[in-house]
Structure formats: C-alpha cells, structure tokens
C-alpha cells in the first residue's frame, strides 16, 4: 500500500510525504511519521524505488487507527479497523489526569496508530508521549528533532520540563505496561495540528460523508442527518471522529490503488461503550434532572433542582469532582458497586455518626493539588502553595489512619509503605518550612537546625547590626568627625557595605574614599573598611536566601517523587467524601440499599421521586415497580392528565441510575439487574439554530433507543407521537412497541411507556405476554372535581380527563364546553369533519336579523331544536331583575285590559325575547326562546308590532283572531340553517358571567285559583331588562274553558321553588304550516335523535331563597303568576284534555318536550358516557296533578335529575294548593341556610305535598333503594358528564355531582384465571362496571359489537376489551 502511495507522489514531483497541493509543497501531514515509512529502506537504487516490491509478511499488518481528543475533563475517541472496515465512535466520558479510562480504552482497542491533537492539555500529551513516542522530543519553541513544526502552539518537552528521577520512574512504569501488553508491535503516536480537530471542519467532513450517496441533498438536510445520527453535544467525540476521517483521506488507507475520488472504505459506523460503563446520553441526563443545567441559577429554592445538587454533600473539592465523574460515568462493575454500598451503609448508621462527622471535618482541609504540583514543577511555588500541600497531606494521612480502624478498611486498600512514605513527606515538609517566619518575611524560610552552614549565615546576618554599629564608631573617630555626626555603616543587598557621612564632609580630601551616590541628608561612600567587610561577609542576605532556596528545591524534588502516591491517596479521600455524602443523604431521606442481581429485573416497593418529594406541598405517594418478572418487560401506562405518569417514570430512571453509582435508592425495597444503558424520550431540547422540529427531535431519541437498546437496557418513553397527527403518532408508537415485543423477553429492553393513545393495545402483539398495563387511581369529588391519588394500579383506562385539567388551569368554560361536545361526537363515532363549527357573539346581530327565516324553514327549525336539547348550561342573568318591578306592575294592569291590547303587548314582548342582555344569560332558554329573533326597540303601535311577529308553531288558533294571525305570518324565503346552528351554539359562551345569587323569572310556578280562572292568563317574563314586554298570548276561549273546570281551587298562592329552570314552560310560536304537519315532523325528528344527556341540577339555585328580600319575593310571586298560564299548562290542567295529548309528538322519553308522567321513588335517573337519560314511562301512577307539573321534570330540573315529581295518589282532579303555605312561609327568612340534602320543598303524596331537593346517591336512603332495586354497582367516570357538571358553576363546592354518586376510585375485578383474554394476552386491565339499569343489556350489545369491529386509525376512545368481564364469566 505504501509503495503505490509513495510512487504516485514521487511521480508528481512532490518530495514531501502525502498528497501535495502543488509542486514542491507538502500537506499538513508533513511532520507526521506515516505508518510503514521504512518500506523504502533500499532507497531508489537499481530502480527499486519504482518497482512493486513484495511486502514482508512479518512486517505487514492491518492498521487500527485510534483518534483521541481530550478537553475540559472530557475524553472522546474514534477508531478505524482496516481489516473489518468498521469505524466506531465513543461518546464523551469524564476523565481526570490519572487517565484510567484512557488506559483502559487503549488496552481494549489495541491500536497500531494513535493520533492526537498536539495543542491540547500538556498532561494528556505527556501521558501519550512517554508511552508511545519516547524518542521524539517536541521543544518549547515548537520544533522537533526532524525540523520545524507547523503548529505554533508551545508544547511540552519531556526532557526539560521534568526532573531526571521522575522521567526514570515514568520510563519504568512504561516498561511495566509494555510487559503487560499482548504480543505485537507497540502503538505509534502521531501528533497532528489543531486544524485537524476543529469542530467546524469535522462537521463539514461528516456532511460530505452523509451526502455522498445523494448529490441532490441540501446542506440543511445533511446537517439534520448528522444531528439525528450522532450526538453533537459530545464535542470531543465529533472532533476525534472528524480528525480520523481526514487522516484516512490524507493517507488513503486501503485505497492506494484506486483513483483519488475513492476514499477509504467504511462499511459501518457504530457506537461503542468502554467496558463497565453505563451509556447515558445528554438528553437522558437532562430528562432525568441528573446534572444541573449550565445556565441554572444556584439559588433554585427547590424548583429546578437536579439530582447532583441533592446528592452533593461533599466537603472537599476533589470529592465534588469525583461525584461529578461518577454521575457522568455510572458503572456496571458489580463488585465496585457492592463495595460502595457497604461504605454507604456504614456511614448511614447512627452509631457511626461520630466517625462520619470526624472524617467530614478533616475532609474540609483536603484541597486539589494539581495546581500545586504545577507550581512545584515550575519552581514558582509560594508560601500559600506549601501551606495547602502540607495541610492536605496531613489530612490525607489522618483520614487513612481513621479508615484503617473501621470495618470498611478493606474497601480502601492502601499499602503501609505508601502511607508511611506520604507521612514522611508531610512530616519533612512541616519540619523544614518555618511558616510563622515565612509570613513575616513574605517568602519561604527554613527552620533552624536543618543545615549548619545556613544556621551560621543566619546567625551572622542576625548579628550584623551590632557589628556595623561598632565599625561606624571607629570610622567616625578615624575621620575626626565630632560625636553624633550621623556616621553609619550600612548593608545594602546586592550592593554591599557602604559608609554614610554628612553632606558637608569633604570627600575629595580623602584619597581612599569613593563617592557612590548622595541623598538629601548624607553621602554614601566606599573606603578600605567597607571593602574589607565585603570581602569578609559578602552579600550575606543573598547567601542566606540561596541556601534556603536550595533546601526548598531539594524538598520539592523529594515531594515530586511521591506525587503518584499522594494522588492515589487523594483519589481515596475523594471516594470517601462522596460515599459519606451518599450516606448522609440516605440517612436524611430514608433511602435503602438496592439488591443488585444478574437477572434482568427492575423491582421496587414504595418508590418515590427524590426531588419532587422535597418540593411537593403535600405528602408524596410512593408506588411500586415491577419489570422483568415472568417475562413481562413492557409497562404501558395510561391515565388522566396530570396524574403523575411522568414523575413515576422519572422515579424509575433515577432509581436505576442511583443504583449504578453505588448509592441507595428512594424506595423501601428494590431489586435491580445491571443495565448497560439508559435511553429516554422525555425531554426535548429545542433550538431555532439546529433546523429540526420538535417531533424530529422526538423521533431522533426513539431512533437512538431502537439502535442501541438491548435486553439489559432501560427505555423510558413519555407520550411519543403527540407532536404529529394522531394516526401517524399511534402508528409509529405501535410499530416501535411491536418491534421490541417481537424480539422476545430476552432481547426486549425494560420499557416504561406512557401514552394517551387508548387504542394502542389493539395494535401491539399482546400474545407475546411481554406487556402489562398500568394506570393511576383518581377520585371524583362533589361537583365533578377530579382528585388525583397518584397511586399506581394495574389496568387500562380510556379517558384522560383533559377537560378537567383545562378547567383547573383557567380555560374559559365556553371553550371547554365546545371541546366536550366535540369529544362526545367523536366518542359516538362521528367523524371530525362532520362536526359543525360554532361561532361567537361577534356576529350576533346578523344572526338575530336572520331569525325570521328560521321559522319559515321547518328543517332549520328542527335542527335548532335538536341543537338546543343538547345544551347543558345552568347560569342565570342577574341583570334581568333590574327593571322587573316596573314590568310586573305594568303586566298586572294589562291583565284586565281588552284582548286586543293584551295581544299587542304580547306581540311586542315576543320581538324582544333575545335582546342583547338576554343573550348574556342563555342558560336553559326554551327552544322557541332561542329561536325568536331579536329586534331593535321601535316606538310603534300595536298593529305594527304584530306585523313583525314571527309565527308561533304551538299557538292555539282562536277563531276570532284567525285573520290577524294570517296577516302577521309572513315567511321569509331565503334559508338560514347554518345560522341557526351557529346562533344556538353562540348562546353558550355567556354561561359563566352571571352572578351566583341571580334570580330567574323562569323559576316561578303559578298554581291557578278560582279568582284567576276567569282572568286572562299571566305572561312569562323575558330574561332581558333592557327590552321587556308581555309574553305570548294564548287562545282566550281555551283558557276560559279550562279555568271554568277548576272551580274548587282557592285563592292564588305563589310558589317559589329553588332556583331551577322548568324548561317545559315554552312560548308558543306559530308554524308556517298546519299543526298536524308540525307535530309529525317534530315527532319524526325526535324519534330519530338520541342525544347524549347528563342530568344536572344547580345546587346554588337551592340557596337563592335565603338571599331574597320581601320586595324580591313579591316580585317573584308576580313572576310565578306570569309564568304559569302557558297553553301547555292550560291543556294539562283541564279535565277534558286527554292526559296523552302532550305526548302525542312521541318525543323520546328524555326529551324536554315530553311530559314526565312516571314517578318511581326507587329509581334515580342517570346517564353514562354512552347513553342518554331514559326514565321508565308508565302511566299507572299518573294523576291529574302529575299532569300539571310533569313538564317540570326535565333534564335540567331537580324534579327529574335526581327524583321524579309524583302525582296525587288519590287521583283528585283539583289539587289543594294550600299545602304550599308552610313552605313559602319558611322561605321568608332571608338569612336561613338551606341544606341541599334536607327538605326544602313539599312533594305531593297521599298524606301531604312536599317538594324535596334531590338526594345524592351517597345517602343511606338512596343506597337502600338501590339495593332493593338491584341497582347498586360500581360506577365508571364519564368524562363528558364530569365536565358538564362544572361548566356553568363558579363555585365548585356547591356543584352537585353529575350522577349523584359517591366519590369513587377506579375499581378493578380480580383477574379470572378462566378468562380467555388474560389467559392469552396476560393484560391486567381494569373493569369499569356501569350502573345497572334496564338499559345495561343494550349497552353490552353495543360494546360487543364495537369491540368486534375492525379497528381504525381515528381516535379510539372506547372501553378496552376487558370491560364488564365479570358478566361474561
């Protein structure tokens, strides 16, 4: 190979190695010794240079090139095997300056060639050079023995930077390492320039490789492929990977005979993990909150805390570094993990607290010595470095002496000789350096008694002041100067001895005196005396410093010889610090030791999240975990939103991680098999710079799990597939699970999957007996509020309670109501595109103007009726009572006026039913109220008002007014069916703006009296206060006839019911066609419809009476009078009218237009998620009184939602209304609080009439009734019913439960061994039993037929296959 390559370059005229960029120019590999460069040892003589010479088989070998990159304490690598043409990469791992993992990596790979960046850490280069390239020397000026290097960064010189003793020791260690290696040639080191390892160049090379098979790919596409296939966060791995590819391109390894366009063959790229390490990527670290974020504030106050911050109780710097290293590199070495667990157990015990506290105190004095050793090496160590060294070494010795006396001494093996040597170094350093004097002198000084010569010099220097004073006196006398003339002999370092004389002294007169310099006070001169002192003492201070420096250098040399021993003790101390931290955390939080086993199982009892338990405001609920037992390794978790699925799965991941770093786990008991990697799809790191969508990142993480997960891996997936279409997400998730489950229990990883795709069990192979289903228990409190218990239980649910979560988070009720209706439509099988849209109040004006067309279009009218029946709103408009007092007086005066004036007033009222203010409270409007148009106020005469009236389809035609009726019914031709639907839905947006204690004029019930029998019927008040007018007129002849048939009724009594709307009191618009046609159309439409209904009662309305004042009560009495005499009630109060007359439309039993003539005190009407309210219609108990009030029992009325309103058992024709006197008398007290569960109204029976509020099913009476009727059973939670129970209520506490049930949790039957589902699929799903009723058989048939049908990809919200299993068995 090398022959062809050299031959090619020589023919080009390039004398340098490698492919040149032109004649006479080399490449960046000029200074690199390429492999087998000795093939041309014979040179070019005899033409051998240009001939193909056979290679010596002994010299030939396949190359294994290892590329290394080390920076910021992280090591990345990649290597290429020429024999197999495989390229393998290793993600970044944490590495210290001992390079233990680097040694293990080289031993495992056994490379023949190592390439490294010569500009990286000097310790890294030194480690490689001393072992794999000891001959080559790189000097500090950037030159080598072969010439000048292209790299201008100063690099390390092993011969100059270290002492001879240390170099010899390293050479000996290298020889020992070589002896341990297998047979074969040693690896050769090539130091490449820094541009080979640049990140940008590596990315470009990877892009070129990714787009080699498709030239049409853009740069963005190539980058996305790289992002999805490689971990870009592993910077050192990417750098080494790119450098390796560039090196292969430069050397053309394996393709020397091919054209230049051919690159080195790479069959596959794989990721490898260093032995005994658990692979964990960056996304998993972030998802499980293992390490803190780089930008995270230190003061988190419990929010955003990481596991590392929780576990960091280390007292030393080396301990913190060791803890981070363990977190970066969890191990699979079971012996090492068991050893750590023993130490943690020892430090956790209370009886070892004294030893633990002592060790922690000493560890606080241990410092990192890497920088200290560098200062020692460069000779720039100062006093602070020596203090740090001596303090640390003494602390290390003390710690090891304590550990050797404990039962865990075997876990920290230290040779006695090594400990003795380090102890000697500490003693020697402490006894040589005088730290007290050094602080005064500002330099390192040596103690007395270390060196005799040094002691003599020090004594001489200390006695020098007395000597110089005596000499100064002698010179003063010799020079003839007067006493006290300031003559002095001075010693100046580096200058010597000088004589100081007064300035007026004549230096020129003395021939042996030389002037050196002068000051403003004296002259400094030299003479024979100073020269004699220089000869005798010399520069004594410098001699003293030099002597001390020589001793310190000797001490430094001896310390550096013991550097490795000291570093080893530092490593032991760091491990002790981390294990003490683990023990303190375990004792503080009550963690326990996990049992490490070889079998692939993950089991735990009372497991909880260690971080969430610290920040949660209430007690945390632990759960159990089981995976791998009996071959079940896939746990599919479903349940409501915000029930704790993600926290549960994170707890599992953290438990497994903690067990692989030797820590205790937050569980009572745990059994964990060793895992080789932890892969998650929980956390998505979004960035606008990477060009990838959120779903693409999710797919990237799942793809990583599919590529790397083995039978001993842990895979955690949280709601994968939610970032795209439901069908596509479900398909991908089902395919991923099928892929793993088909591999079998041995090769399938431990999978913990949470999803809201409730149809997932239908698309995975349950027959493999690998999957199990889990869910969380919830309670339904009063008012339909969901209470999460966060308790795991086996089972599978088909609802997520997303609407409840949305309500709790403040989503407006109209939005939730619309979502609930869409959900019910989808659950009923309606396609999403078939669900009609709804509009807001923005186009209300236009819709009101078009309402006349509705009554002309019968189909549109029927569709509007259906839309109204499905509405579930119960709020009231407080503003409707502002002008009610004036309207009442006006209506009373109009009651005795001629019929023509009454009709005109009623006509004016009907035009203003849906005013702007009445639209703010459209809760429980009657069907025709919702359809009547809203007209602007106009000051017109009665005839003009009548001309604009819309037809009344239920109006009883009077012979005397027939002509007038025909005159005002002018149908409009253009259709407005879409507007009808929008208008009906638009009313529901105003459900929550009404006051809690508002009054409704529709809550009044008027009992006819003899006085009123001959008078005109009362009118029903509109909701609006802005436009108020009398109600619709009825046939005077019919009303008079009915009144005459009830002569025994006493004076009018006003009945005020709890605040509850009776929807049966409708206005009566006229149809543009005949009455029979209308009746047949309504009957046919309602017989075909089967709306989903949930009976709801407004408990707040039952307390409205206590807020009423005498004035309001009088107004309510008038309203009751006005709301009573509608044509429907008139028909029912007549003896001549057939009791079945009002039911002639044949509406469904739960329709609000059908009279409820049945009362069964033992049956509580209800609804489920799949069926409407179906009361048993029977006329055996019907009575005339029941006929009058039966229409009050609607789906929104208390008389039908919980308890039907009974008729008079005596069958009397004219009921005595005096029975209500006591009730109305009690309601006068405005401050009296009415309990919703106590008697607040009379209901008619054989003895007396008592109106009673509905009793919840939790009461003893209801329980006994259900028991007698055989209806007591478990209840399933209907999400739609649950949400509808809260839509219109501002106060949750006062909201009744939609179905009157006790707060329940999910109930599951015991698994039946004979059940074919469990026998074949082994899926532990829950059993939701519906409340038993006469319609259960119908529902069972529906469920069976639904489950037998072929599944589709649309949203599947049906119950799972195990529903009602007890009945089948």
UniProtKB/Swiss-Prot annotation:
Which terms under GO biological process does the entry name?
chiasma assembly; homologous chromosome segregation; mismatch repair; reciprocal meiotic recombination
Composition bias (Basic and acidic residues) maps to 884-894, 1073-1084, 1254-1263
Question: What positions does the entry give for ATP binding?
Answer: 639-646
Q: Which GO terms describe its molecular function?
A: ATP binding; ATP-dependent DNA damage sensor activity; double-stranded DNA binding; mismatched DNA binding
Q: Which CDD domains match?
A: ABC_MSH5_euk
In which residue ranges is the amino acid composition biased (Polar residues)? 895-915, 941-950, 991-1003, 1049-1065, 1111-1124, 1153-1167
Write out the GO cellular component annotations. Answer: chromosome; nucleus
Q: Where is the composition biased (Low complexity)?
A: 1024-1037
Note the Pfam families from the entry: MutS_III, MutS_IV, MutS_V
- Expression sites by tissue: Expressed in the germline.
Compartmental location: Chromosome
* Record region (Disordered): 138-190, 880-915, 935-1135, 1153-1182, 1248-1278
SMART domains from the UniProt entry: MUTSac (SM00534), MUTSd (SM00533)
**Amino acid composition bias (Acidic residues), ranges on this chain:** 173-184, 954-967
* Keywords, sorted A to Z: ATP-binding, Chromosome, DNA-binding, Meiosis, Nucleotide-binding
Superkingdom of source: Eukaryota
**Keyword Cell membrane tagged:** no
Entry's family note? Belongs to the DNA mismatch repair MutS family.
How does it associate, per the subunit comment?
Heterooligomer of him-14 and msh-5. Interacts with the brc-1-brd-1 heterodimer.
Job of this protein: Crucial component in meiotic recombination, functioning at some point after the initiation step of recombination. Plays a role in promoting the crossover outcome of meiotic recombination events. Required for formation of normal meiotic crossover, and crossover and chiasmata generated by artificially made DNA breaks. Together with him-14 and zhp-3 plays a role in the activation of DNA damage-dependent apoptosis at the DNA damage checkpoint in pachytene cells.
Q: Which PANTHER family match?
A: DNA MISMATCH REPAIR PROTEIN MUTS FAMILY MEMBER (PTHR11361), MUTS PROTEIN HOMOLOG 5 (PTHR11361:SF20)
What is this protein identified as? MutS protein homolog 5
